[in-house]
Each structure stands twice: as C-alpha cells, then as structure tokens.
Amino acid sequence: AVALALALAGGSYAQDDTAKKKVKAYMVSDAHLDTQWNWDIQTTINEYVWNTISQNLFLLKKYPEYVFNFEGGVKYAWMKEYYPEQYEEMKKFIEEGRWHIAGSSWEASDVLVPSVEASIRNIMLGQTYYRQEFGKEGTDIFLPDCFGFGWTLPTIAAHCGLIGFSSQKLDWRNHPFYGKSKHPFTIGLWKGIDGKQVMLAHGYDYGRKWNNEDLSKNKDLEKLAQRTPLNTVYRYYGTGDIGGSPTLGSVRSVEQGIKGDGPVEVISATSDQLFKDYLPFNNHPELPVFDGELLMDVHGTGCYTSQAAMKLYNRQNEQLGDAAERAAVAAEWLGTASYPQHTLTEAWKRFIFHQFHDDLTGTSIPRAYEFSWNDELISLKQFSQVLTSSVNAIAGQMDTRVKGTPVVLYNANAFPVSDLTEIILEQPKTPKGFTVYNAQGKKVASQMIGYENGRAHILVAASLPANSYAVYDVRTGGSEKTISPSAASAIENSVYKITLDKNGDIISLTDKRNNKELVKDGKAIRLALFTENKSYAWPAWEILKETIDREPVSITDGAKITLVENGALRKALCIEKKYGKSLFKQYIRLYEGSRADRIDFYNEIDWQSTNTLLKAEFPLNIENEKATYDLGIGSVERGNNVQTAYEVYAQQWADLTDKNNSYGVSILNDSKYGWDKPDNNTIRLTLLHTPETKGNYAYQDRQDFGFHTFTYSLTGHDGALDKPATAIKAEILNQPIKAFSSPKHAGTLGKEFAFVRSSNDQVVIKALKKAEVSDEYVVRVYETGGAAPQQAAITFAGEIEKAVLADGTEKEIGSADFNKNQLNVSIAPYSIQTFKVKLKKKADLQAPACAYLPLDYDRRCFSWNTFRKEGNFESGNSYAAELLPDSILKADGIPFRLGEKEIANGLTCKGNVLQLPTGHSYNRIYFLAASAGEDAVATFSTGNNSQEITVPSYTGFIGQWEHLGHTEGFLKDAEIAYVGTHRHASNKDEAYEFTYMFKFGMD
C-alpha cells in the first residue's frame, strides 16, 4: 500500500521501510534560465536552450528516478522552433511524467510590475500551449528567481486553477520581517487579497549541488525539514540563470538517497507534488496560513523603476491590447470583420515574455534591450493595427452623415466616461476655430490646442457609454481665444488654484471647493533629485534606504515658467529647467468640465544624470501614518518608510487621506510603479533611477540616459477614499477616449453603439476577448470595492445563447446565470470571475469580394531549414518557410496568396507593369512587400494615381528607444503583415533575426 501511494504521488522510488524515516525531502530539480540578463535572447536560444534540452534528455535516459522540472512556455516554443528532433523526444518524457511542466505560464515573469490582467494572460497563454502541445497543464506558480511577490498572486493563481507557489527568493531580504525570520514559514498556505489561498513552499538555493552522496543521510536536509512542524523540506537543486541541468553528482546523490537507509525520505519530485500531497488543504489544519504581501526590503526596490522605456511600453501594450480586443469582438459580432486571433495572441505573447524578471525589471545588458524594445514596439504596432481596422469596421455600420467632418470616438473602458479627448484633423491651412457636436447633435465644448504640418489638434469634451462608439461632428468655424506664451507664476480653474515659486515648484495648491490648502506649509510639490544614488552590489536592482533618507534637492538651474495655454477646456504652464546635462520640461495642466478635478503633470525629460534618483514629491497638508496603494485588484495600506519596507510598488494610483477621513489626495500615473512615504504628510512617486556603480554592472551608471515622456496626475477628494472611483479615474488616464477619422455614409447602427456594460461600478469588466480555442467570448470581471459581495448585470448588445463560468485559463468550471442579453454576476470582495459567453450573431461575416493577382515570380524568397541554400532573398538569406502559412496569409482581414515555398515566390520590382482584373468593381489593390536591403522608397501607380511609398527592410528592427550613446530612436511607419522569428542564412538558422512582410494599399 505504501509503494502504491508513493507511485501515485509522483512516481518516486518505493522506500523499503518508511517508518524509519524521520523527515521528508521533496527534491525538485530545475535549470532556471534567464531569458535575458548578462546575455541576449540569441545567446539564450543558441546555447542555453540547447544545453537544457540535450543535457536533460541524457539524464532522463540514464537515471530512472530522475525527474526534471522546467518552466516557461516560450522556451518550450523555442525548443520546438530550433530543436524539433529533441523536442519530439522530450514530449515522450513529458507523457511519462518525468519531464515536468513546472509553473503554468508563458514566461516565468515578474509579478509586481505587470498588471493583474497581464499575469492572468501569462498563465492562460502558457496553459493553452501546454494543453495543445502536450495534452497536459501546470498546476503551480514556479518562480525560483523573482524580485518580490504581491498579495494578488495567490488570488491570480487560484483564479487560474493553480494550487501552489514556490521560490528561492523568500530568503532574499536584508532584514527579518516576520519575527526573527525573513519569511512567515517555509511551507504553508498563502492567502490572497480575495481570501483564496494556495500552498507556499520555500525552495532554497536553486543552484545547490551534491557530489555523489547518499542524501537520505544528509544533515542539512534533515535540519531544514525540522524547521517546520511538518518535518518536510521542499528543496530545489540544479542550476540557475543559464539553464542546462543539475550536475551528474547531484542526480546520483538523489538516486542514492531514494534507495538509502538514512533518516531522510528522499523524493525525486515534480514541482507540484508537495502541493498535491496536501490536497484538500482544509484537511490539513497543521498548515500555517499567511495573509499579506511577500515583498523584498532592499533587493528589487530599483526594479519598480529601472528601464523606464520598458515600463512605458509594457503599460501601453497592456492597455492597447485590451482596447484592440474589445473592438475586435464587437466588429466580429456585427459581422463586419473577422477576429484576428493569431495576430492578437502573438502580440500578447511577444510583449508578455519580456515581463521576465530580468527584462521588464530593468536589469539586463543594453544589447538585450534592443530586442526588448523592438518586440514591445512590434506588439504596439500590431495592437494599433487591429484597433484601427476593428473600429473602422464598426464605423462602417454607423451613420456618419454629419455637416462637418465625421469623427468616431471609442471608449474602451467598461464604464461610462465623460472626459476630454484629442482629435487630429487634416487641415490645409490654419483654421480660425472649430465647433463640435456630439452623437445627439448637441454642441460640446472644444479647444484648438495646436496646428502644425497641416494638422489641427482639437481638445473635445466627450461623453460616451461603456464600451461604446459615437459619431461626433467637427465643423470649421467659430473663433478660438489665442494667446502668446507669457511669463506666469500662477494658474487656476474652477476647482484649483496653483502658485509656483521661481523654480517652478508648487508652493500653494488650493482646492477652491473646500477652501483647502493642499501643500504642507513651507514645502513644495516638485521634482526632487537624490544626488547620492550609490548602489554598488546590485545597482539597477536596488534603491538604498540611505539614498532616500537624505534630503532631496530641487531643480533650479535655468528655470523658466511660461503660460502656454489658456483656453476654455485647458490651461497650462510650461516649466523648463536643467540639472547638469539633464533637461526638464514639465507641463502643469488644469481643465474645465469633467476633468476639472484632475491636475496633469506631463513631463518631457532628456535624462543624462548618473548617481541620481528622480522622484515627484507631494508634501501635503494631510496627515496619516498610512497611505493606500493600488495592487491592480484591491489595494493595501502601508506605513511610513522603515528599514524593512521603504521603496514599495503600486500599479496605477496611490492615495494619502487624512486620518480623520476629512480630505485626501490621490496620485495617478501612466507608467510608474515605485513609491515611498518618508513621513505622515508626504508621498513620493519614483520616476527615474540611474545609480552610481562600481565594478560589476558598470554600464548601469548610464541606465535610462535618453528622452522620456510620462504623465502623473493629482486629484483631491472631499471625505474618505472611494477606491472604486479612484480606480476609474486612473483607468481613464491610462485608457483615454480614442478618436478615428471616418468617411460619410449611412449606417444601421445610428450615431452611437455600445457593446457591453455593467450595472455596478464596483463590478468592472477587465477583459473582453474571443476565447483561444472556441468561438465564445471571454468576459472577465473584478470586484473593486473590497467591502462586501456585489451583484451586477452584464448587458450585451446581443442575446446570450450560452454562458459558462470559467477559470482564468478559459477552462469551464461551472454554470452561469443569464437571461436574454444579461449575464448575472455575484462576486466576492476583490475577487475575479471569468465567463465564456456565446452570443447570437447580429450578422454573418461578409467577406469582401477579392481576386488574387497572378505575379511572374522571379526570386526564391523562402527556404526550408533542410535546404537553406536554395533561398536567396538577399545575400543568401531567406524567409524561413517552416514559419510561414501554407498558402494564405491574412493581414487585417485581407487574404494574400503566397507563392509555393519550393520555387520562386517573390517578384523583384524593376519597373514591372501588372495587368489588373477587368469587368469587376474592385476599388482597391493590396500587396505585400519588403526591401531586400535598407529601407527603400519606390513609386507605385494605378491609372492616374501614383504613390511614393517607403518600403522597410525585410529584416532588422522595426523600432528602438534612443538610449544615449547606444541606440538611435526610430519607429517604422509601414503596416506589419507578417513577423518571422528567425531568418535562414545559407549555413544556419539565425535565431531571433526577424523577417517581415509589410502590407500596402492603393485606390
């Protein structure tokens, strides 16, 4: 019976006499592999992924008790792409349960900076890959190396159907935090912010090695097991950072320990076996429970801020991906466009794997970020393309017949939004002014805020229902109050009055509604510099407490304050100054109308200051020893800076409310994550971190040198903090109303169309997408109040035919209550719920009439891996045929027929004349093209229409952030139709040398 139980638990060797064993050791092998760190992704693929698969296949064949654990779906995908024979061999061991899928995600990512939704997507993408490739799925969060763990992690894990979490980093604190310990326990239960729990195990050092010894007699294992009343140790062993495998001596030691007669029962374990052995958890009252955060104190504090461009691109991808999916769902339901599943999934995968803990965290070498920035920008372009084509498809069914120029506004948020939006209109000459009318024909406030290069920029007061589209009418005419920039030191609107000192710092901020001065007497709201930012051991990783304990300085050199806007909707002061070689330009913006209670601080900074930390400092006429910080779902209160917790993370907002709940101030942001609270009156947002280095990581003393743009905002509130309302304000900053041009035409949808809404502001729709493996739509909701269970009706534009409850990985787990077009939700505080719904389609998709134009191919652009020399797009290089679809490549719903892969499949443009089809009403031609060398300018003509088109190179980078002295910043304009993740040279695969095709169209 004992032997059978052990076999079921994890296939471990049957002990002859387990009664003699005093303690139990779950030996969890791993070859932790940093996707990028002190190397780039090409090295990872060419060396470390190969070492991992080849070495472990050897060990699995030689040692019958060996079980290998490996995490990260993207690395499995690279094995399939680059080492297909070994991949097929590996699949057999996965089937046997000896090569174990550790973790459950697409990448073993940071879990603090990514949004909650991105973390759910990470797990969903990983589990989908594992199910499709192996017929298996993970059951745990496996993060041997990561820089702190938030209170939301158990909530996310449990929602995705996972049961456990392990890491070696629980010991990576400089100071005890839980009594005399650095962590609450080594094995127990961790409760999330919604009350759901997973099992937690501390894995100790993942690089532990042994040299051919009997681990059943190992005193260290015995002592570690005795640290817990369970007499059990969960022990990593293997290698860290560079992949590979455990040493031969370590594997032999585990094998000997399994058969040994010492006091330690040795189990060659999967990463989740311990957790499974304790199911159901409520049958084990001996398990201690922890309810709270597991952050680090020193290590990782810099990771909330390092590599600011990555943080910005990541936040933008999270927001733009969401907006694109919602629009694509509505367009498909209307029957006006197909849902671009492949493009969206690949775009999410591409930026999510850069959430890896040495990538998004800002701790990799500069060369690595060239690949990261490029991938982030590719995803941004793809999301933008999907968003634009989807909104255009919806707009095509709307009535855009207006007197002036029709503009379609899109509110991607799941709640009604009244806010300001910026519209850009082509105008041949400077207009005198504009008048704007909403979808109901009512005139709304507007303000022209700029005109350059034939484009007018107009600020418009808009109000849109949840997840909706509206036609606005923009007419030339009227008059704008124009001003010439002038010196000023004060600005006010209907809510606030701001006074600046000569340095451009805010010395007075009055809430006129409450006659409340917000700035602490003798202090100023300002950009604050810490000029002794020394961090020698782990420079980018760590902001030291001694740094932020010092008094920061104001930026005073060359201060110039100018009133640059004074319109009906927006007024703005521009403050320019410098510190050393760093240049600062900050716009303080006040508004009227729906945004009147929000002050925006828009920043343009050319940063060139080493040994310097930049924060936005808010010393307030408010007193509380605690502030509230946004966690993405829910929030947490934290106190003033102490040695064990000083630089902390938050997502989109933080709040300081007076302890008597009489008044409070919320600080919102669009791309920043680090915060601190030095005293009862002050909260600070960390903006840029460039440490002084010594020895290792010397390149980090120029970290973030370059041009940065970002916004943070201040909003005051009378009375206690309203968490759902503050979350909505932060969402509006991050997901503003978007504007799209449209031609005039009739449409059955009228001038306003809404797809989905929630009846309860505390039950927020956080995701709307098509399911990965079915034709259902996925709807995910969060409860944002945290005080009591909530009910809501989620109302769709169409009738619900079917609805089920699902987990975060889109696996059905129960039934759902619905009636006609309403989905009825009952949700616990700070909980997440996911549903899959099937809607009755409004119309079937009508594919556009199209014809394929035959081409006289003269170039072998593609090659198979086995016949790489037969392709020659450029200098012996070619597109990888194995990555391309068999015949039809779709780009934004347009199908392109590719040439056969084994023969000529590309046409060299050299003055060719092509015959277009006749006798049909085709009105547009689309083609795929790429330049064989550098970007090229070519002229394409149809009839009397000629266009000069820039055709980008088929390879290289699409874009880069400009890192001063390292890279030049650029972003190519062309629409991406295809991305290939490796290139063929005549003699090898060139890993992560991308190839592209670009889509062009002409009337």
Give short role names for the model-derived ranges.
Residues S119-F147, W151, H159, K219-Y237, ...:
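CE4/NodB-like, metal-dependent polysaccharide N-deacetylase domain
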Residues A1-A9:
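Bacterial N-terminal signal peptides
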Residues Q15-N122, Y130-E133, H159-I163, L189, ...:
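N-terminal catalytic cores of secreted or lumenal carbohydrate-active enzymes
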Residues E89-G97, E117, G150-W210, P952-Q960, ...:
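Surface-exposed loop and adjacent secondary-structure segments within mature catalytic domains
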Residues L4, L153-I156, T186, T388, ...:
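C-terminal (or distal) subdomains of carbohydrate-active enzymes
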Residues V111-Y129, Y204-A225, K571:
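Alpha-helical scaffold elements lining the catalytic groove of polysaccharide deacetylases
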